[in-house]
Curated annotation (Swiss-Prot):
Self-association and partners: Interacts with UBTF. Interacts with DDX3X, EIF3G and EIF3H; the interaction is independent of RNA. Interacts (via HA2 region and Helicase C-terminal domain) with the components of the large ribosomal subunit RPL3, RPL7, RPL26 and RPL27. Interacts (via DEAH box) with NLRP3 (via NACHT domain). Binds to mRNA. Binds to double-stranded RNA (via the helicase C-terminal domain). Interacts (via the helicase C-terminal domain) with MAVS.
Organism, as annotated: Homo sapiens
Superkingdom of origin organism: Eukaryota
Keyword Amino-acid biosynthesis: no
The organism's taxonomic lineage, starting at the top: Eukaryota, Metazoa, Chordata, Craniata, Vertebrata
Function noted in UniProt: Implicated in nucleolar organization, ribosome biogenesis, protein synthesis and cytoplasmic dsRNA sensing. Stimulates RNA polymerase I transcription of the 47S precursor rRNA. Associates with ribosomal DNA (rDNA) loci where it is involved in POLR1A recruitment. In the cytoplasm, promotes elongation-competent 80S ribosome assembly at the late stage of mRNA translation initiation. Senses cytosolic dsRNA mediating NLRP3 inflammasome formation in macrophages and type I interferon production in myeloid dendritic cells. Required for NLRP3 activation induced by viral dsRNA and bacterial RNA.
Region ranges (Required for nucleolar location): 1-80
Protein name: ATP-dependent RNA helicase DHX33
Residue ranges of domain Helicase ATP-binding in the record: 84-252
GO biological process: positive regulation of MAPK cascade; positive regulation of NF-kappaB transcription factor activity; positive regulation of NLRP3 inflammasome complex assembly; positive regulation of transcription by RNA polymerase I; positive regulation of type I interferon production; translational initiation
Gene: DHX33
Domain Helicase C-terminal, residue spans: 277-450
Subcellular location: Nucleus, Nucleolus; Nucleus, Nucleoplasm; Cytoplasm; Nucleus
């Protein structure tokens, strides 16, 4: 609440009244079932304010009685009988329930206890791997069983299930991979599509795959497949219509009033406005009331965390101490857990988070939310072929979700760092990823599933024809496609690419590596790029980080530097003290080793020769150039960079080891757009290698540029 903002009188609402998931906003004729839960309608007694333990937090007590009492205290428990009666008789259902109501942990258990799993496994999909793992851990605790037995999980490169598993949490991408070999999903009796409102690219494809499997099983007289779509908020009419007019079940949850404040004037610097808001709240509110701030990404969060800590050291006497905690997906797991723990006496928790705190987790103690109204999201331009991460406005639905974090346990306050007029111009719903992302991976998966015509696939929200054609063109350039009888099919190379749980370009990189005798090195590099950041870069210790990293830096770029770090990590046996001294995330680096082992196994199953370059760095760089040729840039006469094929202006990201260098030509892994378009994860290459890799492609691009 910046002083210059001049907040108007507060507007009150009850959590859920803003988004279109409330019963009052359902269209006439839609079947809506209101399910009474603890804390709604005056029911719930003394337990009405108990909270579901956060996803990543272990159960509060090792004693079965305490765990069972916790289950019974959840808002959803009051509706258990009604829910089972409804779900038992429905093929499809859309279920809406507030974050923290217990729906994700309890619905699978209710279905299992009601006998739904006798004819097949109950699958629960999640957009994020951390949620799938922690939810499976929590539910296995509640069922008093070893993880991997009755309850298990499957995420990319990690399968903790057995023949006994009846409740299986998995990422949406992993269920898609299973559909490649079994399009009917025969092993499942029920698929629960959780956090459906996030509309990730994998989730949207999964909607169509599950719907088709359900229909086909019915046509073949197979055991029916039950499909339940769950979320804290969503466009229920769209989901209900898509799943054959599925009834909407609404869990009436605990609702506490929240005051919403807007700024009087637009804020040019949302980071400064957020900082001012935090310290005004901190100096006026009791220390027991915690603050949640929404920013866009790791760099912003770490920078603001440092600034908050520095300012907090110089506050006047009598002001509470401040415990500043960052929260983002690539943060080491142990540090993520800290947000769920209570602050020491006399301290206020200030949690600075990405949108991971919108719906995926429940954090207790939050009284104030500071919403910058910004989020980092992918955008794809099929004309230029560029996919970038860009900071943009949230949707109205996201804004209401953020606001609702303040009303989990008691009345709350949300400070929106934008005007009410600006809010009214926000998109109603978040644009699905499938309409704003590169679709090459999607098309490869659909073709691997032998979908007859990818252009007519039953998407809930259809991507533009330009996006689909651009994806097909990319796969064609990678040698993955061929045309047979007016139909697209996969080439032998394409089928091999689909066998890897990777982006097509990285799968192609591995498959190209035997030609350059560097498969061992490429497996390591691709594994490093497939895992959340293995490097920890606290802004407060920037000079120290640069000092210890000097010994690893390669003049050939970031890929080779990461390769050097991984080799040292392996040579020292994954020493955790070494990781700490060198600002390396030991957990993520261990995961890299596991990912690498699985990718290597896939290569061996294909009878691929696996050789090492034995220190020949050029062969590794040539391999990267031959497979990532669509992600390259060249130095221009004025000292700037432009992409090789579309001549889009780009710059080297400050985090790159090449930031102070001017190599003539580079290959990059990712583009990030902030104040300009930055390339991340770079490798120095020779421009001539690109023309060797795709001569016709670059000749065509050169002609277009001249014209």
């Amino acid at each position: 609440m910046p002083e210059e903002a001049g907040f108007p009188p507060a507007k009150r609402f009850r959590p859920g009244s803003g988004p279109p998931s409330r019963a009052g906003s359902f269209p006439p004729g839609r079947q809506v079932v209101m399910l009474l839960t603890a804390g709604s309608g005056g029911r719930g007694g003394g337990g009405g304010r108990r909270q579901q333990p956060p996803l990543a937090q272990p159960s509060a007590s090792p004693y079965p009685e305490a765990v069972e009492l916790q289950r019974r205290s959840l808002p959803i428990f009051q509706a258990r009988g009604q829910l089972l009666a409804q779900l038992r008789n429905l093929d499809n259902a859309v279920l809406i329930g507030e974050t923290g109501s217990g729906k994700t942990t309890q619905i699978p258990q209710y279905l299992y206890e009601g006998g739904i799993s006798r004819q097949g496994i109950i699958a629960v999909t999640q957009p994020r791997r951390v949620a799938a793992i922690s939810l499976a851990t929590r539910v296995s605790d509640e069922k008093r069983t070893e993880l991997g037995k009755l309850v298990g999980y499957t995420v990319r490169f990690d399968d903790v299930t057995s023949e006994d598993t009846r409740i299986k949490f998995l990422t949406d991408g992993m269920l898609l991979r299973e559909a490649i070999s079994d399009s009917l999903l025969r092993k499942y009796s029920c698929v629960i599509l959780d956090e459906a409102h996030e509309r990730t690219i994998h989730t949207d494809v999964l909607f169509g795959v599950v719907k088709a499997a359900q229909k086909r099983r019915k046509e073949l007289g197979k055991l029916p497949l039950k499909v339940i779509v769950m979320s804290a908020t969503m466009d229920v009419d769209l989901f209900s219509q898509y799943f054959n007019g599925a009834p909407v079940l609404y869990l009436e949850g605990r609702q506490h009033p929240i005051q919403v404040f807007y700024t009087k004037q637009p804020q040019n610097d949302y980071l400064h406005a957020a900082l001012v808001s935090v310290f005004q709240i901190h100096q006026e509110a009791p220390s027991s009331q915690d603050i949640l701030v929404f920013l866009t990404g790791q760099e912003e969060i770490e920078a603001m965390s440092k600034t908050c800590r520095d300012i907090a050291k110089h506050l006047p006497d009598g002001c509470p101490a401040m415990l500043v905690l960052p929260l983002y997906a690539s943060l080491p797991y142990a540090q993520q857990l800290r947000v769920f723990q209570g602050a020491p006496k006399g301290y206020r928790k200030v949690i600075i988070s990405t949108n991971i705190a919108e719906t995926s987790i429940t954090i207790t103690g939050i009284k104030y939310v500071v919403d910058t109204g910004m989020v980092k999201a992918k955008k794809y331009n099929p004309d230029s072929g560029l996919e970038v991460l860009a900071v943009q406005r949230v949707s109205k639905t996201q804004a209401w979700q953020r606001t609702g974090r303040a009303g989990r346990e008691d009345s709350g306050i949300c400070y929106r760092l934008y005007t009410e007029d600006e809010f009214e111009k926000f998109d109603k719903m978040t644009v699905p990823e499938i309409q704003r992302c590169n679709l090459a991976s999607v098309m490869l998966q659909l073709l691997a599933m032998k979908v007859p015509n990818v252009l007519t696939f039953d998407f809930m929200s259809k991507p533009s024809p330009d996006h689909i054609q651009a994806a097909i063109a990319q796969l064609d350039l990678l040698g993955a496609l061929e045309h047979k009888d007016d139909q697209l099919t996969l080439t032998p190379m394409g089928r091999k690419m689909a066998a890897f749980p990777l982006e097509p370009k990285f799968a192609k990189t591995i498959l190209m590596s035997p030609k350059f005798h560097c498969t061992e090195e490429i497996l390591t590099i691709v594994s490093l790029l497939s895992v959340d950041s293995v490097l920890h870069n606290p802004p407060s210790r920037r000079e120290e980080v640069q000092g210890v990293r000097k010994k690893f830096i390669s003049s050939e770029g970031d890929h080779m530097t990461l390769l050097n770090i991984y080799r040292t990590f392996k040579n020292l046996g994954g020493n955790k003290d070494w990781c700490k001294e060198n600002f390396v995330n030991s957990k993520n680096m261990t995961l890299v080793a596991e990912v690498r082992a699985q990718l290597r196994d896939i290569c061996l199953k294909m009878s691929m020769p696996i050789a090492s370059s034995r220190g020949d760095v050029e062969s590794v760089r040539r391999c990267l150039a031959h497979s990532l040729f669509m992600s390259t840039a060249e130095l221009q006469p004025d000292g700037t960079y432009a992409t090789t094929d579309t001549h889009q202006p780009v710059a080297i990201h400050p985090s790159s080891v090449l930031f102070h260098c001017k190599p003539a030509c580079v290959v990059y892994t990712e583009l990030l757009y902030t104040n300009k378009c930055y390339m991340r994860d770079l490798c120095v290459i020779d421009a001539q290698w690109l023309y060797e890799a795709a001569p016709e492609y670059f000749r065509r691009k050169l002609r277009t540029a001249r014209n």
